Amino acid sequence: MKPEDIVPEFRVEAKDYARPTPVEGVRILSLTRFIDDRGFFMEIFRSRAAHDGGKPLAEFFRGVDAAQMNYSIVDADNHIKGLHYHLKQDDIWFFPPPSKAKIVLYDIRKDSPTRGATQVVVAGGGKDLLVRIPAGVAHGYRPLTNPCALLYFVTVVFDPASPDEYRVAWDHPAVRDLWEIPNG
């Protein structure tokens, strides 16, 4: 069978399963759940590896000066948090169970090899990830659960007198379609 053998209204391009090029400097670590009949346990931070199993987490945080840890909850339907970026700080995001979110990243660094690239990450809902977002990468998220919790580390203490937070419109042409939830 060929595309021409399909009724014209249903002739569309084949779904593209290619993975986009990730934004330079964004790091993602899948966390391990230790599950038994009582529930589960999961490490989300480790400053050093005391055993082989702790090496990936300790390596992920190597060189990270965690200055502040924050917790945020969105309990509004159909809401988008973002976009914003920082000049001085990196963020490390974690959506704790049962929260789930669609993270949108947009590289706006002038000299980055991935300048202008976008990346989408779905985190939470059983896909336990840490996502490290470097300074200069605009970021935001769309909750996929209500409520949706975000636990995150930052590398600079927040100063209300001199906030290191700059806005990019959530519906900027480079990202406006990335917030959608695809059907089909």
Please report, for each region that a protein language model flagged, where it lies by residue.
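Conserved metal-binding segment of the jelly-roll/cupin
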Residues: 123-145
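Non-catalytic, conserved peripheral segments adjacent to functional cores
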Residues: 1-126, 146-184
